[in-house]
């Protein structure tokens, strides 16, 4: 069964714009439906909350965030050319990070970014590549997040299982 996306309150997409400039509990469902790479239906019959980021390609991160926030605040339901969504989390799931990202991409048709690195030295090489702008060409990023993959291990480190690295 395909379940339609029926309501998107702004408080559930706070991460979408990178900062909260939208009044909480504002229904932005119709705006979200106009973003071309967000699936209109999902092939499961349960409530699911997906978090991610709205962005525009080839813009500085702060400018891209302002464009996304402006689009969501604007009262008109006009499509925004070039606005994209990348998913990074399903709320309240017990899937490990890799499985969750695969599920988002393969089963639910969301765009995701995912790298699977197992050694600290590889994470440092990845960080240097990102700082040198060798990654995410054309996609505005002001940081990367390193996460522990294993769900059970995450539960033993509730505040420390993920770490943001910013410019």
Question: Which residue stretches match the model-derived regions?
Answer:
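RNA/tRNA-interacting regions in translation and RNA-turnover enzymes
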Residues: 1-167
